[in-house]
UniProtKB/Swiss-Prot annotation:
Specifically methylates the N4 position of cytidine in position 1402 (C1402) of 16S rRNA. S-adenosyl-L-methionine binds at G33, G34, H35, D52, F78, D99, Q106. GO terms for cellular component: cytoplasm. Belongs to the methyltransferase superfamily. RsmH family. Its EC number is 2.1.1.199. It catalyses: cytidine(1402) in 16S rRNA + S-adenosyl-L-methionine = N(4)-methylcytidine(1402) in 16S rRNA + S-adenosyl-L-homocysteine + H(+). GO terms for biological process: rRNA base methylation. SUPFAM superfamilies: Putative methyltransferase TM0872, insert domain (SSF81799), S-adenosyl-L-methionine-dependent methyltransferases (SSF53335). The lineage of its organism: Bacteria, Bacillati, Mycoplasmatota, Mollicutes, Acholeplasmatales. It is an enzyme of class 2 (transferase). It is found in: Cytoplasm. It comes from the Bacteria. Keywords: Cytoplasm, Methyltransferase, rRNA processing, S-adenosyl-L-methionine, Transferase. It comes from Phytoplasma australiense. This is Ribosomal RNA small subunit methyltransferase H.
Amino acid sequence: MTLRHISVLKEEAISFLNINPNGVYVDATLGQGGHTLSILNHLQDGFLYSFDQDLKACSDIQKKLNPNWPIEIIHSNFSNLKLELAKRNVFQLDGILFDLGISSCQIDDSQRGFSYLHNAPLDMRFDNRQKLTAQEIVNFYSFEKLKNIFHIYGEEKKAALIAKQIIKNRPLKTSYDLVAITDMFYKYHKGHSAKKIFQALRIEVNQELEVLKQALSQSLELLKKDGSIVVISFHSLEDRIVKHFFKKNSVFEFPKKLPIMSVDYPQPALRIITKKPCIPSEVEMKNNPRSISAKLRAAVKNI
């Protein structure tokens, strides 16, 4: 079944961005443009830069935009934030939004290999310009490397067994070739047998966790004082990175016996405004099942 992509936690994200109508903003994950259009609706003399590494997403949204709207779409990975903005003489932002979820359109594209529900070549690249594909990983990575990817990125308990069977059954070309292997171990398991393996491969293909760390660091440098950063994540690995980054930059740690009074502490870079992650309402989860795992964290630049 094909689902229309619905932006998750859209109202909450816009609220936490606290948009200045004349400010400069980045939507780091354009996708199908839901959050981008919401930000645009709050701008007057401001400007928005929307990033996406998926050329199709950029092209699809570009066709729908009024040429007079204050927006530029940038076909690039969000790990290139500073580089791409510097090309445009932009060195400070009033706010930045990350929606880390894969779009429904990408999942439902039967030729891109993101879904275990479609028989497609094992590709999984967000950006077709890059060389590494999921097919190369399953056919050429060593047992140890496959096992580690499945264990770390997929949190898969049977990582070693699945990796061993993949090597035994090489070459694998399609998503159904891979599903046939995971079904050996989870035939009667609740949920799909390949879910964690597909997640792990997608993360490895696109280096999702590494580029997220890079983009968060760059965001902190780019934000003005009182600028907002909002991140929506969809699995524990992403959320853990965001949580750690916010915490690390919102406190100062000194040796316990150092004679410094609390009033002398330098101000931390960030002030966290979501003490606990914001999650979708029951109504949103019912209307959009893909929102169920979403968590939103937000912070404001202090200095």
